[in-house]
A protein has these predicted regions:
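Phosphate/NTP-binding elements of NTP-utilizing enzymes
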Residues: 2-140
Length: 140
């Protein structure tokens, strides 16, 4: 990137092509906190990918533990809120504490759109710049 303050036209066009893929956005733009309490880029696991491939307007998800489905749904809600116009979503959970935790995942992923990890690669820097631009568009 010659100028990190704005996207060049060709760079912008290349981002437009990848941003049109929801799966790409889910696996490249969003950061979550792992079990060790460290930030890591969200990457769909097998159960999440299977649900994503079969996603429909209404989905029944049987209760299961530790498959990451609530994390996937939280990232999907954030993604759809950012990239679809007039999209509204909400969380209904068993307790306020549980619901607040899920909203916290969304909040963290949004705040971390422009996160640069320690010892970043060129891709990390480019994705952080893209995240900064996305946040700038939302806040404008």
């Amino acid at each position: 990137m010659e100028n990190s303050n704005h996207l060049t036209e060709s760079w912008s066009l290349s981002w437009q092509s990848v941003l049109s893929s929801q799966l790409w956005r889910l696996e490249h733009l969003y950061w979550i906190e792992n079990k060790a309490g460290q930030l890591q880029r969200f990457s769909l696991n097998r159960a999440q990918r299977r649900l994503h491939e079969r996603l429909w307007y209404r989905n029944d998800i049987l209760k299961a533990r530790q498959l990451g489905i609530s994390t996937y749904v939280a990232m999907l809600m954030l993604d759809m809120s950012l990239f679809r116009s007039n999209f509204h979503c909400g969380i209904i959970d068993k307790t306020l504490v549980d619901g607040t935790g899920k909203i916290g995942k969304i909040e963290l992923a949004y705040r971390s759109l422009d996160y640069v990890p320690d010892d970043p690669t060129e891709e990390d820097l480019a994705l952080a710049e893209l995240g900064r631009l996305i946040k700038g568009e939302i806040q404008a």
